[in-house]
Amino acid sequence: MKNMKKIIGSLFFLAISICSCNSQPSNIQTPTDTLPIHIQRFDKALLAYIETQDTTLEKELLKEYPAMLDIVGKGILNLQSPEVSGFFDQVIAYYSEPTLKNLYKDAVREYDHVTDIENQLGKGFTFLKANFPNMQIPACYMHVSGFNQNVLAADSLLSLSIDKYMGEAYPLYQDFFYDYQRIKMQRTLAAADYLAGWLMSEYPFEGNENILLDRMIYEGKIKYIVHLALPEITPAQLMGYQEKDYEWCVSNELTLWNTIIQRKHLYTPDQITTSKYLDDKPCTFLSDETPGNIGTWIGWQIVSLSLIHI
């Protein structure tokens, strides 16, 4: 670790300046009370409509879930406003595809009860609110996307695509996802992804997306904060690593830094190279053993080490 400190000593000032912005608490607050969080089950309501095709439910959906219909329509189905004629016909057509419909029913069955996730979100958002007093706590929902993006965020709204969290052994995943992707598709990471999605929505990336150091510190800061909010999730789990892969990173941290610096990847504005460091795919361009998303892991180490010195 002493060698590591020497190598990245020149990075401390930049890391600290980024991590000390208004979005990062300078003094960590540990609240004792917990905010109650209730997840609104848009997923169940929409499935009831899809299965019955009862047009009277359309008005109920428009009344109860107007924002969710809008964001799911635009973000997943590429549809315009729910008020437009034919909107619900296209929703039914999309979700009636046999494989997707079975996936939808499996997901709703798996997430019939979500008290465990609500409790985690309560603790997590309580921590965020204590340390980010101006942060708005969103209304939380669940939906099924058909393997689209994990989290949808809009003004005061946050929704998780539960079909992406069925457990790495879920049969359908075997045909669509690699091992390194499936390890993240677990219920135990649902709350963490809710929080990460909201942090990214509230505090979007403002650096140069082509510069590796900018991206590493931003992604590392998100992991750092989520881990503080949900400490029961291990760093390996939060990274989507096997324990052996996480231990490899710790043991080879100095070597990783030497390689990155020697190749001049840290500051060079190169979108292709930078994206490789943040891809879930194993980073074999560094070594055969390097796990994916190594840029985020290194960023997390920079943030953690830098804040110790503030």
Region annotations inferred by a language model:
Residues A45, E60-E64, I71, G75, ...:
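Residues that form generic nucleotide/phosphate-binding pockets
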Residues Q90-Y246:
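Acidic/His-rich structured neighborhood in mature extracellular/periplasmic domains
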Residues N22-D89:
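N-terminal mature-domain "stem" immediately C-terminal to a signal peptide or N-terminal signal-anchor/transmembrane
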Residues M1-I7:
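Positively charged n-region of N-terminal signal peptides that target proteins for export
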Residues I7-I16:
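Sec-dependent N-terminal signal peptides
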Residues I18-S20:
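C-terminal motif of bacterial Sec signal peptides marking the signal peptidase cleavage site
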